[in-house]
From Swiss-Prot:
Coiled coil: none annotated. One of its GO terms (biological process) is carbohydrate metabolic process. The keyword Metal-binding applies. Activated by phosphorylation. It comes from the Archaea. The active site is at S88. It comes from Methanococcus aeolicus (strain ATCC BAA-1280 / DSM 17508 / OCM 812 / Nankai-3). It is an enzyme of class 5 (isomerase). This is Phosphoglucosamine mutase.
Length: 452
């Protein structure tokens, strides 16, 4: 696809022309649309162009303003579909457009392809006359409806101390308030709206969260009362990463394992959904519960689709900080996930670091290798054809090529948005991990040299 990547449209300097075309294409399939946006400086520009396209095709619009993506996803249930203007964790010069179904799930690739077909093939294009233009309504109650819904979905009786870092983005309008509403003592960091993300870059990783991590460590050094933990969001608060009482950023894979165990023990579910790039620690950590871990393609769309295939599956996540709680709603929700983290700590009566440190730790290595887009198919065909002999393991082609060994695994998959092929390995020790990575890199390079 020309416009849509693995998570909607995201690009540097997204133009009003593209926003108009997307809006017009959407108007051909939906006549009642709810729209939200994050705090980026180009948000109004993109919104107005999107609105022009929607109106030109006869759609009615409900604007809910600056909201987290999970608020938009929750609100979509009352309309034909939802549109979120956001570039998620990307820097401030980026913006994007993400489309949502009524059930809160993101558009699937075939739905996005249909939008592109309308744009580029001028398929089913119909403009309305001047006297059929619909209205743009404003719903200032959407955020409160979402907040009330989330508060009704969690039960937290213990008093916690939480530092909430919203990256000056959409989470600012909801996350600190909801943590306060459940009785937590909250310190808000980067908690005012600023589309330049002046406090930190919106991707919640170790580099960008250094100040918040040091703050939590300092707060707890001489604190004999409740120890602070940290909750950090990306640019639209559909993701969440936690910082433990020692000021350490929690590993995404370990957090996924802990969440999965909590949901299994609390609800009795025997099915957990995750992606092909998640750690084997999750199977190890859940082994005594006889939980079936089902792996799917990378991306929240694939996780939510797989959740819907299994009635007993109520939780899924991926090691990017994306957590989906099907028993509540199907949109990835960083705020709900942060609150459920408090629920989990209360359930086990343990500190966060105690829960995280209980998860097995394996050696992880990764590398990304330059690969022109027109060579990706050739390279992956070569990897799939030759990888089983190289690794002495059967290949799984759910998403890229994954080789599972007794003491580790290798995942080789092409980037959906960049001219790279990524190699990720995990093993029970550093020596095995290094050997697997070297084999994976050589396999990709040999594929690049393959002539067809």
């Amino acid at each position: 696809m020309k416009l849509f990547g693995t998570s909607g449209i995201r690009m540097k300097n997204l133009t009003p022309e593209i926003a108009y075309k997307v809006g017009f294409a959407v108007s051909q399939i939906a006549k009642n649309v709810v729209v939200g946006r994050d705090t980026r400086t180009t948000g109004d520009l993109i919104r107005n162009s999107l609105f022009a396209g929607l109106l030109n095709g006869g759609a009615e619009i409900v604007d809910i303003g600056i909201v987290p993506t999970p608020t938009l996803g929750y609100s979509a249930r009352n309309y034909d579909m939802g549109i979120m203007i956001t570039a998620s964790h990307n820097p401030s010069e980026y913006n994007g457009i993400k489309l949502f179904n009524k059930d809160g799930t993101s558009f699937r690739p075939e739905q996005e392809q249909n939008i592109e077909d309308i744009i580029y093939n001028k398929k089913n294009q119909k403009r309305v006359s001047w006297n059929s233009i619909k209205k743009v309504w404003t719903d200032e109650s959407a955020l409160k409806k979402y907040s009330d819904f989330i508060l009704d979905s969690v039960e937290i009786n213990k008093n916690f101390s939480v530092v909430v870092d919203c990256a000056n983005s959409a989470g600012c309008v909801a996350s600190p308030y909801l943590f306060t509403d459940v009785g937590a003592h909250v310190i808000s960091v980067n908690g005012h709206i600023d589309g330049r993300f002046i406090g930190r870059s919106p991707e919640p990783n170790e580099k960008n969260l250094q100040d918040t991590m040091h703050m939590i460590k300092g707060l707890n050094e001489n604190n004999k009362g409740n120890k602070y933990i940290g909750i950090a969001h990306d640019g639209d608060a559909d993701r969440m990463i936690a910082i433990d009482e020692k000021g350490r950023l929690t590993d995404f894979d370990k957090l996924l394992a802990v969440f999965s165990r909590y949901m299994a023990e609390k609800t009795g579910t025997k099915t957990i959904i995750t992606t092909v790039d998640a750690s084997m620690a999750i199977e190890e950590y859940l082994k005594d519960l006889n939980v079936n871990v089902i792996r799917t393609k990378v991306g929240d769309v694939a996780v939510s689709d797989e959740l819907n295939k299994h009635d007993d599956a109520i939780f899924g996540g991926e090691p990017s900080g994306t957590w989906i709680h099907k028993d509540i709603h199907l949109t990835p929700d960083g705020i709900l996930s942060g609150l459920r983290l408090l629920e989990m700590m209360e359930f086990y009566d343990k500190k966060l670091y105690e829960l995280i440190d209980d998860v097995p730790c394996y050696s992880n290595l990764r590398e990304k290798l330059p690969c022109p887009d027109d060579k990706k198919i050739i390279v992956m065909d070569f990897v799939i054809k030759n990888g089983e002999n190289i690794f002495d393991a059967e290949v799984e082609t759910i998403d890229g090529a994954r080789f599972s060994l007794d003491d580790g695994w290798v995942l080789i998959r092409p980037s959906g948005t960049e001219p790279f092929v990524r190699v990720r390995v995990e093993a029970k020790n550093d020596i095995i991990a290094k050997e697997l990575l070297e084999k994976g890199i050589k396999l990709v390079k040999d594929g690049l040299n393959e002539k067809k």
